[in-house]
């Protein structure tokens, strides 16, 4: 895989591509990373080649109508069947990116009432259905739908990680993505700046380009300063993450564990930059 700094650069470049960037990030980030970091070898062999090639797409189902920031208050439940071989999932998720075309869903549910856990659910599983596409203000080229689960039966091997440890998956994967969100916004800001400069040079008032006026120059200068500061902070944090992960990996920690621990250490910085 690519190092953290390269991923940061890719996120920066893709920033202006709103809908595509949203779809790509939801797939390669929160959609794939739970399997990469917490999946069994069987999970990885089954899903990652197809997800990595783009043959399959992934969606991350965490948010519910009554639980957004308070993700652990989810009401979606998963009950173990009497024979102990399957889980039956019932509940509702909303604002799910990629839902309209996802082949596999990362689904969080409560086992036994209060054991927050994570499951892999494939599209086409009986009882899984989708709501209509949301009428959004922007990123209209990205699929965003509700996902409904009505006694959706999955084999117990579809459990990601351990029962009751779903919060580790949910929050650690989100921690990895926090820096990317900031970088994507930076990339979009750079594109907006290019458009603003072009317009300022083309727009004529009082027989001259408005870019000659001090007020416009001041605004463009302020944008430049803020983008430079943001870029410096984001790429510095990216390097800190990379150095931390590499150090842990060199000392015997697996790649996945090293990246997660590095993300956890710098999660606050990443959240602030986002």
Protein language model features and the residues they cover:
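Short Gly/Pro-enriched turn/cap motifs at secondary-structure boundaries
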Residues: 66-69, 95-98, 110, 136-143
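Long, acidic (Asp/Glu-rich), low-complexity accessory segments flanking structured domains
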Residues: 151-169
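Beta-sandwich/jelly-roll carbohydrate-recognition scaffolds of carbohydrate-active enzymes
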Residues: 46, 65, 73-79, 94
